[in-house]
């Protein structure tokens, strides 16, 4: 009887140690991705997106395909710094 009790406690302890602990930073990772998007304005002449980050203007080239180019001058665009992508076709 005593060996059975010790075995149960031993296996319960092993199960507790073997299970991974859930990370709390999963929500923070999602928040960081959301905070890495910056809104800006398109330049039709240069086909670029200019956005403000940290008080400085940054310029990123839009795509050369028809569905990636700027629609019109001063049209809203969005740069995703996490994925390094620019979207010059975002609806306003």
UniProtKB/Swiss-Prot annotation:
DNA damage recorded as keyword: no
Keyword field: Antimicrobial, Disulfide bond, Fungicide, Host cytoplasm, Secreted, Signal
Keyword Signal carried by entry: yes
Record localization: Secreted; Host cytoplasm
Record propeptide residues: 19-34
Gene Ontology BP term (one): defense response to fungus
Secretion signal span: 1-18
Induction of the gene: Expression is strongly induced under nutrient excess during the logarithmic growth phase, whereas it remains under the detection level in the supernatant of cultures grown under nutrient limitation.
Gene3D superfamilies in alphabetical order: Antifungal protein domain
Disulfide bridges in this chain: 42-70, 49-77, 62-88
GO cellular component: extracellular region; host cell cytoplasm
Main function: Antifungal protein that acts as an inhibitor of growth of human pathogenic molds and yeasts. Is active against the model organism Neurospora crassa, the opportunistic human pathogens Aspergillus fumigatus, Trichophyton rubrum, and Aspergillus terreus. Provokes a reduction of the incidence of infections caused by Penicillium digitatum and Penicillium italicum in oranges and by Penicillium expansum in apples. Low doses of pafB have self-inhibition activity. Also shows activity against the model yeast Saccaromyces cerevisiae and the opportunistic human pathogen Candida albicans.
Family from the record: Belongs to the antifungal protein pafB family.
Name of this chain's protein: Antifungal protein B
Organism, as annotated: Penicillium chrysogenum
């Amino acid at each position: 009887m005593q060996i059975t009790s010790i075995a149960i406690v031993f296996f319960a302890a092993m199960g507790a140690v073997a299970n991974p602990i859930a990370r709390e930073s999963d929500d923070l990772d999602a928040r960081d991705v959301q905070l890495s998007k910056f809104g800006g304005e398109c330049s039709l002449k240069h086909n670029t997106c200019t956005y403000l980050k940290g008080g400085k203007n940054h310029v990123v080239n839009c795509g050369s395909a028809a569905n990636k180019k700027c629609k019109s001058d001063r049209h809203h665009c969005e740069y995703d710094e996490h994925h390094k992508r620019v979207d010059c076709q975002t609806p306003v």
